[in-house]
Curated annotation (Swiss-Prot):
InterPro entries associated with the record: Cecropin
Role of this protein: Cecropins have lytic and antibacterial activity against several Gram-positive and Gram-negative bacteria. Also has activity against fungi.
Protein family membership: Belongs to the cecropin family.
Pfam family, one: Cecropin
Subcellular location as annotated: Secreted
GO BP term (any one): antibacterial humoral response
This protein's UniProt keywords: Antibiotic, Antimicrobial, Fungicide, Immunity, Innate immunity, Secreted
Protein name per UniProt: Cecropin
Length: 32
């Protein structure tokens, strides 16, 4: 089912972005 696959891929990309951005945000938060 294609729409579901597309949503799944988008969710995975968002989660990957959060995983990468999370530590950076934490470091910036500590620095300020």
């Amino acid at each position: 089912w294609k729409p579901f696959k597309k949503i799944e891929k988008a969710v995975r990309r968002v989660r990957d972005g959060v995983a990468k951005a999370g530590p950076a945000v934490a470091v910036v938060g500590q620095a300020t």
